Design a protein with these regions (language model features):
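DNA-recognition alpha helix
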Residues: 92-105
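Charged, often Cys/His-bearing segments associated with DNA-binding zinc-finger transcription factors
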Residues: 1-48
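Active-site- or DNA-interface-adjacent structural scaffold in DNA-acting proteins
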Residues: 108, 112-146
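Basic, short loop/linker segments at the boundary and entry of helix-turn-helix/winged-helix-like folds
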Residues: 34, 38-77
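Helix-turn-helix DNA-binding elements, focusing on the entry/boundary residues of the two helices
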Residues: 89
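Catalytic micro-motifs at enzyme active sites that drive phosphoryl/nucleotidyl and oxygen chemistry
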Residues: 64-67, 106-112
Length: 146
């Protein structure tokens, strides 16, 4: 059973649409996060992408039964970062546990000390394939042209 995203914000959590980025940054992480922020604030686009994720990520598993697993939004954020940055799971684990802006994008507030374990990332983010990213890219491009 997977939840798209927890709708109840926690104390200290920043709404994803309100995350601020340094406009002078030349690093690639803020650019990726801005793209994810665009997906988040565009409701029609977000719904199409989550429909795709629900179909593609472990389709044989009963979505109404069992433990919740990692939220689809977190799989999307981590999967896009891993594939776009061409990083291994060790670096991804370091980024999602210690990079403040990435943690905000994952829905963690200032007081949330939840961390991600290597194996959890590997098991869940590993379901996010380059082919799935390509399908998402096609949906985003269509939304940009429409």
């Amino acid at each position: 059973m997977r939840v798209i995203q927890n709708e109840q914000m926690q104390i200290g959590e920043v709404d994803i649409s309100q995350i601020k980025f340094d406009p002078r940054s030349r690093d690639d992480i803020p650019k990726i996060l801005k793209g994810l922020q665009y997906i988040y604030v565009n409701l029609d686009l977000r719904e199409k992408i989550f429909e795709l994720l629900e179909r593609e990520i472990a389709p044989q598993i009963d979505k109404r039964n069992g433990r919740p697993g990692m939220e689809l939004w977190k799989i999307l954020v981590c999967g896009v970062l891993r594939l776009d940055l061409n990083e291994d799971y060790d670096r991804l684990c370091e980024l999602v546990n210690h990079h403040n802006t990435i943690r905000e994008m994952l829905g963690h507030g200032t007081f949330n000390e939840e961390t991600y374990h290597f194996q959890t990332l590997k098991d869940n983010v590993g379901l996010f394939t380059p082919e799935l990213l390509d399908k998402i890219n096609q949906i985003v491009v269509q939304a940009g042209h429409g």
